[in-house]
């Protein structure tokens, strides 16, 4: 998947036609200019390791969580997430900032699901989002 990010950005930068997923990837990259130079490093970006001890945020994970939230909002799953996103966007005036606020509850829900071996608890996840 990492290579898809790099390829989408390369094609976007060259003004080439993008497939739908590539367009989504390029859009989220464009909203994170702090990652662009690093992504353009090519192989170094593909091979980079991100560990809690390293203290570096994983750009691929961060952008992937943006994409996950966008998909959840588009499908309103869990039911009510589109309203939460709309309210957060209204308060901040910025949909991207709303997504940043929503990332931590999503990451927590995914971590808990992985740890328990169960699907994410959508009700608990939505409750966390509603408290933002």
Language-model-derived ranges and their functions:
Residues 1-34:
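N-terminal leader/targeting peptides and immediately adjacent processing regions
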Residues 3, 19-23, 62-67, 82, ...:
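Non-catalytic, well-ordered alpha-helical scaffold segments
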Residues 4, 84-87, 128:
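Charge-rich, solvent-exposed alpha-helical interaction surfaces
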Residues 14, 18, 34-35, 78-79, ...:
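Intrinsically disordered or highly flexible coil/loop and linker segments, enriched in small
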Residues 21-90:
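Aromatic-anchored, charged helix-turn/loop surface patch used as a conserved interaction hotspot
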Residues 66, 70, 74, 89, ...:
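Amphipathic alpha-helical core segments of compact helical bundles
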Residues 86, 91, 95-99, 131:
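Sequence termini and other peripheral, non-core segments
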């Amino acid at each position: 998947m990492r290579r898809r990010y790099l390829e989408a950005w390369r094609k976007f930068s060259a003004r080439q036609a993008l497939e739908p997923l590539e367009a989504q990837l390029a859009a989220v990259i464009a909203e994170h200019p702090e990652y662009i130079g690093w992504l353009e490093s090519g192989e170094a970006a593909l091979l980079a390791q991100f560990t809690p001890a390293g203290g570096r945020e994983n750009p691929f994970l961060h952008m992937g969580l943006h994409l996950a939230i966008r998909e959840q909002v588009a499908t309103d799953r869990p039911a009510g997430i589109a309203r939460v996103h709309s309210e957060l966007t209204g308060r901040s005036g910025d949909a991207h900032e709303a997504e940043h606020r929503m990332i931590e509850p999503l990451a927590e829900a995914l971590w808990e699901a992985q740890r328990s071996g169960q699907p994410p608890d959508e009700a608990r996840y939505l409750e966390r989002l509603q408290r933002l």
